[in-house]
């Protein structure tokens, strides 16, 4: 419910901007990352997005912290032919166990069968400045065929306890039509690594 409330807030705040644009089709996505964390609470991290032309709206839950939601508005840029790039600067509000404002970004760079993807945000905690933090998730992947990819992944998060400031690992992913499934294996040299299963749908 909090995730839906996040998206509703963003939609309400941007109603005027949407109607001021040319008539373009909405594009939506919904995804959930399920974290299996050693000696800690397992949890799901859902995200929904809505894009219309340059406008980008996004809502997340359990991303910055558990039992915490965030709502985002951003602007889509893209370009290139052989070297294709996309960049979405964003600004969001965070509320729940953590209350903050956060500038952020999402971006990708693609060439041949290689892709670099990164998303990040600087969370400025409105209660305790010492709790402010930079969150990041980055991937570099190779797709030998259209439906399969593998590569490396890193993340920096405070959603759960970890001895590592930057966690790193391996990933594999498959896609079929509008469905995308990924598996992430963080800190493979630990006795008990962290696993993440991601399922996403574009519509």
Regions found by a protein language model. Give the residues of each.
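Acidic pyrophosphate-coordinating catalytic loop
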Residues: 127-131
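Intrinsic disorder/low-complexity detector
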Residues: 18, 31, 35, 138-141, ...
């Amino acid at each position: 419910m909090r995730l839906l409330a996040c998206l509703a807030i963003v939609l309400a705040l941007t109603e005027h901007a949407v109607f001021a644009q040319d008539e373009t089709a909405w594009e939506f996505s919904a995804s959930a990352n399920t974290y299996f964390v050693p000696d800690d609470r397992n949890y799901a991290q859902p995200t929904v997005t809505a894009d219309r032309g340059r406008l980008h709206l996004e809502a997340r839950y359990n991303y910055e912290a558990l039992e915490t939601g965030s709502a985002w508005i951003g602007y889509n840029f893209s370009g290139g032919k052989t070297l294709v790039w996309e960049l979405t600067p964003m600004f969001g509000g965070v509320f729940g166990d953590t209350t903050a404002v956060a500038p952020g970004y999402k971006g990708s760079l693609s060439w041949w069968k290689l892709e670099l993807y990164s998303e990040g945000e600087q969370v400025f905690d409105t209660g305790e400045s010492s709790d402010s933090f930079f969150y990041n998730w980055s991937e570099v992947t190779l797709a030998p065929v259209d439906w399969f990819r593998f590569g490396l992944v890193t993340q920096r998060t405070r959603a759960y306890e970890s001895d590592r400031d930057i966690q790193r690992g391996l990933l594999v992913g498959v896609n079929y039509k509008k469905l995308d499934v990924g598996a992430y294996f963080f800190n493979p040299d630990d006795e008990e690594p962290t696993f993440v299963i991601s399922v996403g749908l574009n519509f």
